[in-house]
């Protein structure tokens, strides 16, 4: 065997060993996470933190209003107190926000904040956060669809005093539309 062949075999073998070790660590970590999530699911409802969801919006199309799918079904998986603040950032055409306002008019968990002029996404978020009173705040874009159990999972992670912030996994809804989003 030549030096090149020996080196190639050693490199491929080392790569295989490192890859399988890495995968093993991932599997062990996943099992540990699953066990801790199962234990966390037995939390008393009274000890759950209140969660405020902040949704800034600007110039949403009336044909595609502010998307709140997933938010109304959060209480089924998260029995704690939940409130939603939708902050319209001075849109020129407020038809989309008004349509959402009417759709959730009977639900006390929803509050719509209409800013008089466009001040930017961050200031719209700040306007909503200043009205919120929850123990935890979840910032969501107006075009985001939430999984039905996201509030429950994120609040469970925040129970650890060593954790200062958590983030869910983001998946683009248009991920297969073009080479850029793939």
UniProtKB/Swiss-Prot annotation:
Membrane topology: Peripheral membrane protein
Family: Belongs to the NodC/HAS family.
Enzyme class: transferase
Gene Ontology molecular function terms on file: hyaluronan synthase activity
GO (cellular component) term, any one: plasma membrane
Name the record gives this protein: N-acetylglucosaminyltransferase
Organism: Rhizobium leguminosarum bv. trifolii
Subcellular location: Cell membrane
Signal peptide coordinates: none
Keyword Transferase annotated: yes
Claim: Cell wall biogenesis/degradation is one of the keywords in the record: no
Keywords per UniProt: Cell membrane, Glycosyltransferase, Membrane, Nodulation, Plasmid, Transferase
SUPFAM superfamilies the record matches: Nucleotide-diphospho-sugar transferases
Function description: Involved in the synthesis of Nod factor, a sulfated N-acyl-beta-1,4-tetrasaccharide of N-acetylglucosamine which initiates a series of events in the host plant species leading eventually to nodulation.
Pfam family, one: Glycos_transf_2
GO BP, one annotated term: extracellular matrix assembly
Listed EC numbers: 2.4.1.-
């Amino acid at each position: 065997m030549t030096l090149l062949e020996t080196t190639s075999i050693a490199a491929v073998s080392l790569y295989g060993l490192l890859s399988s070790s890495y995968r093993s660590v991932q599997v062990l970590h996943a099992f540990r996470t699953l066990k801790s999530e199962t234990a966390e699911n037995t939390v008393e409802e009274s000890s759950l933190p209140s969660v405020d969801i902040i949704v800034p919006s600007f110039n949403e199309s009336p044909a595609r209003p502010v998307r709140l799918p997933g938010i109304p079904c959060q209480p089924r998986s998260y029995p704690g107190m939940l409130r939603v603040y939708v902050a319209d950032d001075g849109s020129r055409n407020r038809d989309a926000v008004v349509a959402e306002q009417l759709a959730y008019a009977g639900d006390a968990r929803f509050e719509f904040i209409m800013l008089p002029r466009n001040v930017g996404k961050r200031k719209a978020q700040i306007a909503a956060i200043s009205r919120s009173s929850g123990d935890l705040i979840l910032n969501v874009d107006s075009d985001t669809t939430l999984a039905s159990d996201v509030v429950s999972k994120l609040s469970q992670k925040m129970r650890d005093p060593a954790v200062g912030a958590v983030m869910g996994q983001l998946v683009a809804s248009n991920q297969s539309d073009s080479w850029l989003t793939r």
